[in-house]
A protein has these predicted regions:
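Long, hydrophobic alpha/beta structural blocks
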Residues: 2-315
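C-terminal, beta-strand-rich globular interaction domains
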Residues: 283, 287-359
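Short low-polarity hydrophobic stretches
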Residues: 1, 111, 351-355
């Protein structure tokens, strides 16, 4: 995980970028922002606070990373931080050209140069790109001149108060952001991405059209991809290839996979298949599916690598083993497969569950 405890803003430029599809245009700043100490503290928390996941990307282009325009601008800035102002204007134009979906909201683009960022134990500079699209209402208290008087030992003042509704940015809610660390430049740098609005299809413009990134092939990537592929194999492929595979069987296989990744520091395909799958014919089926998965999704899946704890925690949500019975019951399977039996009688299908204590 990146560490930002010693990070500080060296320079920040603010532009307004609208929606190109609706011809909103963009407004470029003429100079960097002047930051007070208080504003610096607020902005550092606003910009860097959301970056807590160890999932990283690289700037990318099919024709070579040098053909990614954002990569070229970042390289210029890292080479000469004094050109941040000029390059930030070009970056704002790039974002405008990428904002072609009708649902994309206009907003403020912050282009920031940081120092003191730590990645993999090394301190380095970084470039931050942050877009604020959502405005929130807040109340501002207004009061007139105060008239002071003294009653006994208390100083008392009277004034006329009013409330005014204003619109502004909530510094606790970053809409979209990217941090480009000044390392591994020849591979497209190391990029961390935040997109709080990624529930809609048009949100892909931030990662794909503007940043143009691909996931960095590291331990997080390997762990995430492996667990994703195995879950898809168990839930989709296994029932088609082998008769009699029940939901309880699938839940048990997912639990064993989850436990393997939680209990080991390293992944080894041979050990994994023997401990988690065990049955030779199912092992062969999984290995064949694994090869097909890499081709279909254009991913690389090495046979051994270090396991990422944060990737395991994220995948744990998708690995919840739940058997849904009509609309009446949900059975959550966490452990011993031998304690749950499936059958059928004249009343219908049923599950029999053994337990020691009820709570």
């Amino acid at each position: 995980m990146p560490v930002f405890e010693a990070s500080s803003i060296q320079s920040v430029v603010l532009h307004r970028v609208g929606n190109k599809a609706t011809e909103e245009g963009y407004v470029l700043s003429t100079e960097p922002l002047h930051l007070t100490e208080q504003l610096q503290d607020v902005l550092v928390r606003y910009f860097l606070g959301p970056f807590k996941v160890e999932e990283y990307y690289r700037l990318y282009s099919d024709d070579g990373v040098e053909m990614n325009p954002l990569y070229r601008h970042c390289a210029d800035i890292f080479s000469d931080p004094e050109c941040l102002m000029e390059s930030s204007c070009d970056i704002a134009r790039l974002l405008y050209d990428a904002s072609t979906h009708a649902n994309i909201k206009g907003g403020e683009l912050f282009v920031v140069y940081f120092s003191g960022c730590m990645f993999n134990g090394e301190t380095m500079d970084a470039i931050g790109l942050f877009k604020s699209e959502t405005k929130e209402s807040f109340l501002k208290v207004l009061h007139g001149d105060e008239e002071w008087s003294r009653a006994e030992s208390d100083a008392i003042a009277t004034a006329r108060y009013e409330l005014e509704v204003q619109q502004g940015i909530n510094p606790a809610k970053l809409d979209r952001g990217a941090i480009i660390f000044n390392t591994e430049a020849e591979k497209g740098y190391v990029v961390s991405v935040v997109d709080a609005t990624n529930r809609t299809v048009d949100a892909l413009y931030w990662k794909d059209a503007f940043l143009s990134v691909r996931q960095r092939e590291d331990e997080y990537y390997n762990t995430h991809t492996e667990m994703q592929a195995y879950k898809k194999f168990v839930t989709d492929e296994l029932p088609q290839q082998f008769e009699g595979v029940s939901k309880a069987d699938q839940a048990d296989m997912l639990n064993r996979c989850s436990n393997y990744f939680k209990q080991n520091d390293n992944f080894d395909l041979q050990t994994f298949t023997q401990e988690v799958i065990a049955q030779p014919e199912v092992i062969d089926s999984f290995k064949e599916y694994r090869e097909q998965y890499q081709q279909e999704y254009d991913v690389q899946m090495p046979e051994s690598y270090d396991i990422s704890e944060s990737a395991v925690k994220k995948q744990a949500r998708a690995y919840k083993s739940v058997i849904k019975l009509d609309k009446n019951f949900h059975i959550y399977v966490h452990g011993n497969r031998e304690l749950i039996e499936q059958g059928e009688d004249e009343k219908g299908k049923y599950y029999k569950v053994y337990f020691k204590e009820e709570s």
